[in-house]
Amino acid sequence: MNLKKFFNTPTHEPFRDKKAERNLFARRTLVAFLGILLLTGVLFTNIYQLQIVNFDTYQTRSNGNRIKLLPLPPTRGLIYDRYGKLLAENLTFFGLYIVPEKTENLDRTLDELRYIVGLTDNDIENFKKERRRGTRYTPILLKPNLTEEQISRFAVNGYQYPSLEVRPYFKRHYLYGETMAHILGYVGKMNDKDVERLKREDKFANYAGTNDIGKLGIERYYEDILQGTTGFEEVEINNRGKVIRTLRSRPAVAGKSIHLTIDLALQRYITELLSGLKGAVVVLDPKDSSVLAMVSTPSYDNNLFVDGISSEDYKRLLNDLARPLYSRATQGAYPPASTVKPFIAVAAQTENVITPNTTIFDPGYWVLPNSTKRFRDWKKTGHGDTDLNKAITESSDTYFYQVAYNMGIDRLSNWMKDFGFGMPTGIEIQEETAANIPTREWKQKRYKRPWVQGDTISVGIGQGYWTATPLQVAKATTILVNNGKVNTPHLMKAIEGAVLEPYEDPLLYPDINTPKVAAWEAAKRGMYNVVNAANGTGRKAFADANYRVAGKSGTAQVFSLKENEKYNTAGLKKELHDHAWFTAYAPYDNPKLVVTVILENAGGGSSNAAPLARKVMDYYLNQRLPQVEKYNVPIQQKKDLSQESEQINGR
């Protein structure tokens, strides 16, 4: 045994200071109590701030998490022809909508939906574009045009995707596709430029809940009328984003429907006539320049663009050498050729350059004064002694070379601008070129070269630097018919509403005021003889017509010949052949239509374009117009047409 360890082990507890321990405990208790009191004070202060001071703020935030404002897109206005025939409608489809911000794994979800609803790469690409432009927590169309099978498959699997929902939506549909494409244009998905423009014009809010906007044609020009006004629903949602109840709403206001001046039956008839050809036909009512028909071929199906055209289809249209996307009626710029001789005749008489009796000898060419340069007439042997009437009737180039030389380019170009050349016509289609009426300033700016007299001579027969669209030639013809009265070519007949709103001419351009009424009559008499005189260039095409016609042919050269070079069509590529023109009006004493025809690379105007114009006039004056006048149907303001309207439209 270790005695030292035994004796050193204490046998009792050390002394404790009870008072000190009590004081320490009291201090700790006080600190703890003060801490609890402080924290309780902070807690109640925050509760006071939340419940009393900032009650409105946090209530708004709370409501924002469970109350949403859902846009109600309006139904787009319909489009009818002049007799109430439906041209553009809205069809109901079902689409799969997604709220990306409420989707846990977006990439995985998109991948899984490929198998459930047939989601394609194109669908995903369109969705991503819309997401970049859209507002957060707003449903975005992911998969359009769902089939019944796809809807059923999603119904089975939908519980896995609380942020997705199948909803109905309206989709634009064009009933006559290629026949009306260049007039109606189409609606398509908004792009960044559209969004920027809408925001700049303070219209973007009205497009909440819709991705469609008018892109071309009438759909674009009358977008504000057709679009309507977006409504809204204030709804309460649960934690899964599902609507529990609707708190209040403001219904959307549907877009207004519009009636065009187009006669669908005439439009379809002309489309059939132009089948397989490259060209255009414009038909105007000379009383007010309303467009009865405007056809450009080849054309395209505008329904392809509504949901976003596929890259394959778009490449096919772009690479088509026949250029189906290009409206030859409003964008085709061709030398107007001899169709302009009657207009020049009016100008030259008014400027006292010629009178109806002014006569020159036409040997088949014209020589520029103080020069050896010859300008050839289309008729190699010439026309002999030629006055104004004969010059128009036989289309003497030599006569109008002399007229152009005497007038000079300044007066000539100014007058042709009065007839509407070198500027937009004012029609409600933005896809229109101004073409070109040349001036000294234009050539200097374009080619850095001064104007020379030889340039003026070519302009005198509608060649050289002068280009025009078929619509411009048709407009100029109506101005001639009306002795200088200028009406704007237009496609709008009326807008539906509480009261039908008829079209009002914006009067973009002034009338041609000339005291010489005889100048107009002399030009029109020449056009009458083109078709009716034995020596008229268009006589053959209108032989035995049961109505009186006045017209003018034109043959537009695609390239210039050298002085002694002969024109040989057999050795030329098709695209180098002349363009065929013909513009006419009928009946002569009481005009009811103006018809202008251009056929690309078809050859002479009198032998190719004039017969087609004859068919159009025969159909309209002998068949269509009597049918319309018999029923005399007013514009229909309802979608379901009357029996008479159905009969008028050939159904």
Swiss-Prot record:
InterPro entries: Bact_Transpept/Beta-Lactamase, Beta-lactam/transpept-like, PBP_dimer, PBP_dimer_sf, PCN-bd_Tpept, Penicillin-binding_protein_2. GO terms for cellular component: plasma membrane. Pathway: Cell wall biogenesis; peptidoglycan biosynthesis. It comes from the Bacteria. One of its GO terms (molecular function) is penicillin binding. Its EC number is 3.4.16.4. It is found in: Cell inner membrane. It is a single-pass membrane protein. It catalyses: Preferential cleavage: (Ac)2-L-Lys-D-Ala-|-D-Ala. Also transpeptidation of peptidyl-alanyl moieties that are N-acyl substituents of D-alanine. GO terms for biological process: cell wall organization; peptidoglycan biosynthetic process; proteolysis; regulation of cell shape. The active site is at residue 338. Its main location: membrane. The chain crosses the membrane at residues 30-50. Belongs to the transpeptidase family. MrdA subfamily. Catalyzes cross-linking of the peptidoglycan cell wall. Has a penicillin insensitive transglycosylase domain (formation of linear glycan strands) and a penicillin-sensitive transpeptidase domain (cross-linking of the peptide subunits). This is Peptidoglycan D,D-transpeptidase MrdA. It comes from Haemophilus influenzae (strain ATCC 51907 / DSM 11121 / KW20 / Rd).
